[in-house]
Structure formats: C-alpha cells, structure tokens
Amino acid sequence: VDCIITDPPYFLGMTHNGQKGSFKDLSICKPFYRDLFQEFNRVKKPGACVYFFTDWRGYAFYYPLFDLYLGASNMLVWNKQSGPGNHYAFIHELILFHCGKGVSIGATNIIDNIRSFASGAKLVEGEKVHPTQKPVALIRKLIEDSTKPGDLILDTFGGSGTTAVASIESGRNFVLMEQDEIYYFTAQKRIKDAYERFNGGG
C-alpha cells in the first residue's frame, strides 16, 4: 500500500484474559499492536507514509512500539478546536507519523506539524456517526500531502468510513477494515454516497 491512515480504538472497558482494559493497563494489548505494526511494515511500500492517531493518554504506550517496528519520523498535532475535560479541556489529538527515507511531504510547500480542523463527530440523519470520527478534510489533507492520485490507502480501523470517503474525494483507492457491524453498514452507505457524488455512482 502507498499510505496507511488509521485511528485505533481506545479499548476502554475491554477484557483480555479476564482483565479489564483501560488507559492504565494498555500493556495487555501489547502483543496485538506489536503484530499490527509488523504487518504495517510488511504491507506498505518502502516509501509509504503511516499516520496513527492517538491522544495524550495512549501516546506513551504506542510510541515505543511504533518507533521500534516502523521508525517514527515525527509527531503531528491535530487541533480539534474544542473538546471535553474538567482539568483543562484537551482540544488536540496526536498522530504518530512514519515516512520512508528520501520521501518529501509537500515538497512544494512549507508544511508544519499542526493541523487545525473542527471535530468530525456529527449527526447524520439524526444519528451520531461515530464518537471519535475524524473530519474528512483532515484525512484528505494527509492523503494529498503524501500520495498521488490512483495510490492505495489502507485503514485497519475503518470506523464509519471517513478514510474511504477522503480517498474517493481525492481520487485514491482504498482498503478499509471494520469489525463492528453498525459502523460497517454506516461506512458502506457513506462510501456509496461518496462514489455517487464524485464518480457518478462508479
């Protein structure tokens, strides 16, 4: 694949071998993410970029594994412009970034590591699409910064299909994975609608 953009679940409330998951014990997920990053390294092209979303709670866990198996090139900051929190609202998320050697991002423009886009969670036909949905404009910007039309984008935690929609809008191909049935069908509808808008239903 030419680029990987993904936003993993936070695993709040999950159980693993009888243990309850939280940000304090993400170590129970370490084998999963070790295997995931190794697979990223296997399926991506040598010059491909990887964008991996997290927040301040997950960063300390994810970064060492990401750097070990992929090699961290930078950390991007997404300014959401608003957010929850009682002890100073956190209005940003972090994006671990890997890019192959010799690859320039936005070679014709000066690009900093701050991205400001309003939060992507919204109502569609009266229902919330996804609680951590990213704005299409943000994902499209990452895609267009690091790929060219016709390239293949992978998202292993597809959610409601934002990466797929952004790929369609920017003329890229995509592979999307999502195990939650509700989000799967939501993504399916959004993808169909995006094709009808941008490709005449192709």
Where are these regions (language model features)?
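Core catalytic lobe of class I
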Residues: V1-F185
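S-adenosyl-L-methionine
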Residues: Q188-G202
